[in-house]
């Protein structure tokens, strides 16, 4: 009875709240005028700072079509190629994790199937096709020699337009075999709600042709430092804990919300002399933005850390009235209002999430990496709950999607999970049918090489799946 009461209490409170997804599609929103925040902004972490890992791995993403301009945050999760001796003829491929709602703006006719069409298997509307993409970072502009004649600032936001439009490596839709955390609850859901589900997680592929000047700048100044930091995390970089073991975690977050700012900000765009002829497998960029576009708009991707004068990191909101358990864990299956339209089809959110105290990051920060005390990747930030004028409900509640939820090993505590709630969006498990390691294996990326060399059998589930499929074919 107590669990039901808490669940109903949480649901009713959420009906009073608005979930703001923090990947944004807008031009100069007026409500962000005079931006103020308690968090530390526009400060590059030192090497000894715990946020330095987040900084090296994290980038601002910008997608544009004829109809909209979308910003989000992404972080390095994988790559393909030797960063120390890259191929000259083949692109170096970078894989960045972000939110699914951010890559709704990625619509590429040359994308991998099934992402080269919308979720209803229909061709994209020409006005929706992605024409522009850039990847940016708050950094030292002096590393780009051409900027020494343009800008005198020691630090600035620099965004670089790549030569081609990214592709979709992974989208977390319909990713589990069994939707059964609470069978009495799921039985009451409509058939459509049971079928089409999502987690707010995706991975994009950015091909970098290193003979292209801008692509090489992205590779050399952004990606290589990120790879070096990624390797330092080691094979245990992806957290997988029982849900009740998160209560003492502290989450470090660094992202790029789009807010009014006076910082120097520039776009290094593609120029005619940089363009090469690419194979039909890739989509060259057809739209460029003037180098001063961001600077003139004054709505600038702004480096932010969940660090204040009095605290570092975010902790779970351990409050019985504001979470479906007493441990700050959200069960999305019980919140049917958590929905997303991805590529013209509606999905219902599934899985588990973190309810984060005092973590109100603004739009543009969607996709922010959540790193725990042990320097492990625990989740991905995607939005904030807002209760309007009722500050007693703690309006600054951030929400993140947990990436890996193990099978429950404590049958006595029914408020945490049941044995059908497990999933693993990265490496897969017995209940996960759609996970990133499948793509990594098929394309022999760095992550799959790590899986192959690992002694941890839990990371090798993708090989079991492939063997099972081959055996069934025989």
UniProtKB/Swiss-Prot annotation:
Cellular compartments per GO CC: plasma membrane
Where does the protein end up? Cell membrane
This protein's major location comes to: membrane
Does the keyword field hold Hydrolase?
Answer: no
Residues with covalent lipid (S-diacylglycerol cysteine) sit at 24
Q: Where is the lipid attached (N-palmitoyl cysteine)?
A: 24
Superkingdom as given in the UniProt entry: Bacteria
- Point out the signal peptide segment: 1-23
Q: Of which family is this protein a member? A: Belongs to the MG067/MG068/MG395 family.
> What is the recorded name of this protein?
Uncharacterized lipoprotein MG068
Q: Which organism is it from?
A: Mycoplasma genitalium (strain ATCC 33530 / DSM 19775 / NCTC 10195 / G37) (Mycoplasmoides genitalium)
